[in-house]
Amino acid sequence: DIRSGRRRVAVVGNAEASLTPELFEGFTNMGALGTDEGLCKLDGSSIPDWRRASRPFGENCGFTLAEGTQYVVLMDDALALELGADIHGAVPEVFINADGLKKSISAPGAGNYVSFAKAVAAAVAILGENTVKNHSFIHAHGSSTPANRATESEIFNRVATAFGIDDWPVTAVKAYVGHTIASASGDQLMSALGTFKYQLIPGIKTIDRVAADVCQTHTSFPLQDRDVRARGMDLALINSKGFGGNNATAVVISPRKVGEMLSRRHGAAMDDYRLRLEQTRQRAEDYEVRADRAELDVIYRFGEQVIDDSAIQLSRDGLTMPGFGNAVIFDKSNPWKDMS
């Protein structure tokens, strides 16, 4: 909608509160969840290590349910400059593809090859081969299941082979927060924006080693935080999968690279933008200070401007409400005249 001009701003996000008996039972019946028994068996222990329950791309036994929420504000480039918005990144493309026919509803399928390869091809077209080969990283779905670690890593490596990419860093935020279901890709996006800001790729710290069936021919899976300030990361590929066979891959560009692109399009207007950006950041800092002091200035209007039901005027043609200039006009057309 933003690219077509239908919208100038959009709030995008999700929230999920999945820690309920019904969801636990459903995912358990699918054999998708990690269990205390499974963790103990992996570790040769009688006590489960819950801090390391989610183990993407390591020896694992299922994912860990979690709850979360993530939201981002998207706007077109001209509006962002006009408002002096603090730009944390840009999303030029998102590709979605279903698996189609397959043997199991919960098994990984072929659709992710399409979404991921399309995303890499788009990134090359937008930013060039050098950025994709040397200054990009992958935020994997990394659900902490044996099937995911083998199949997703194979996708990454086969696409890397096709595009001539080596030593491609792969991380997985579910090692830190578990699987928040609807907002899981939002977790990945927020972590990617953090990498752009601090130039650190978070390590998959819940595993001691990468599992033997994980394909690592052209990829690397850091187990500790990786400092990439010298290399510089300007591109993240966020990969997401869903039970039922849907897949999505997003291209996310760093604010540094976005700044270069905006300068080429808007030229001298960037000087005015930078002045507005300073004001925006100062207001954000001031708000943070007030919030720390619980000075939230909450707008509370309970009981104000309540519509008086008795003042509603009704007729056969429509109705009017106090405080609204336009009436509600009834649609009297019959779309089923042939059946009436």
Spans of features found by a protein language model:
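Buried hydrophobic packing segments
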Residues: 1, 73-76, 116-119, 156, ...
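Acyl-CoA/ACP chain-elongation machinery
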Residues: 6-61, 94-109, 140-149, 166-218
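Catalytic-loop motifs flanking and including active-site residues across diverse enzymes
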Residues: 65-69, 112, 152, 182-188, ...
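A beta-strand-loop signature enriched in Asp, Gly, Thr, and Trp
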Residues: 119, 123-127, 131-139, 149-176
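Extended non-globular C-terminal regions
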Residues: 318-340
